[in-house]
Structure formats: C-alpha cells, structure tokens
Amino acid sequence: MNENILVIEDEPDIRKNLEYNLGREGFKVSSVGSLHDAHQKINNNNFALILLDLMLPDGSGLDLCKKVKGNIKTEAIPIIILTAKDDEVDKLVGFELGADDYVTKPFSVKELILRIKAVI
C-alpha cells in the first residue's frame, strides 16, 4: 500500500496503537502530538491522509483542518477527524471545514482502517 498517513493525536497510547495497526496494514505512519508539530510535518512531507484529533494541547484540530483545506498545496489531502467529541454540532462544523469523515472515540480499529481505505 505504502501511503503515508499523518496521525495528529495527543494521547500517546492511542497514537502508538494507530501507528502499530496502520503499519500492519502497509501504511507508512508519521505521528505528532501537537498542532505545532503537525504544521511542520505537513509543510515538509506529502501525506495521503491526515487523522486529526480535535482536542490538542496547543489548540483545536478544527483550526488545522481549516488551514489544510484552505491551502492550495494541501487542500486535496483527505482528513478524517478522530475525536471524543460526539455532538452533532462538532460533526457538522468538521464537515463544513472540509473533513472527509468523522470518527468518534472509542473507535474500532478495523472500521477506521476501512474508512481510511475508502477515503484514500
């Protein structure tokens, strides 16, 4: 498969779980725990997909979603929001800002992998 996925998640256990399971599926995985680190990774790499948590220590993942989708160089990168926020309003805002899918925690790794494959 060999697609490069960026995981933006501040919980180390979730990040490691995603790295492991996505790696087993043949994806290359880069992961960061903050928006600051995410900006650097996005600017210096080509990603096939971004998995984005909304609640990060240095801001909202929604801001990053808006920036990625508003930049001509990165607007085509699919974004799947992966968050504990399950209110309908949060989902609608995520989709309005350009997210391609929205998955709430706790999540099924198998289902997430199928969603990733559908979006890529």
Residue ranges: model-predicted function:
Residues 1-120:
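N-terminal/domain-start alpha-helical segments
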